[in-house]
Amino acid sequence: MGSFSIWHWLIVLLIVVMVFGTKKLKNIGSDLGGAVKGFKDGMKDGASTDDSATTSAPAGQVTNNSAAADKTTIDVEAKHKS
């Protein structure tokens, strides 16, 4: 009762093809494929820029030591944002 048989899905597919037509479905498929390809390329580009950023300086490491020489600066880590 909760699952549909293959015949139910074939009837639904036939109705969708009759309503939208094959040309419209082909255009939707190619648009969706282009969007997925663009998303994958974007993720690949984002991963390569993140890798180059992490190799240049590790997160949390201070590269400028002028603050350590200044005795009036207090270095603390905030636990809660008020």
Curated annotation (Swiss-Prot):
The chain crosses the membrane at residues 1-21. Its main location: membrane. NCBIfam families: PRK02958.1, tatAE. It comes from Acidovorax ebreus (strain TPSY) (Diaphorobacter sp. (strain TPSY)). It is found in: Cell inner membrane. Part of the twin-arginine translocation (Tat) system that transports large folded proteins containing a characteristic twin-arginine motif in their signal peptide across membranes. TatA could form the protein-conducting channel of the Tat system. It is a single-pass membrane protein. It comes from the Bacteria. InterPro entries: TatA/B/E, TatA/E. This is Sec-independent protein translocase protein TatA. Residues 72-82 have a biased composition (Basic and acidic residues). The Tat system comprises two distinct complexes: a TatABC complex, containing multiple copies of TatA, TatB and TatC subunits, and a separate TatA complex, containing only TatA subunits. Substrates initially bind to the TatABC complex, which probably triggers association of the separate TatA complex to form the active translocon. Pfam families: TatA_B_E. Residues 49-67 have a biased composition (Polar residues). Disulfide bonds: none annotated. Residues 46-82 are annotated as: Disordered. Belongs to the TatA/E family. Keywords: Cell inner membrane, Cell membrane, Membrane, Protein transport, Translocation, Transmembrane, Transmembrane helix, Transport.
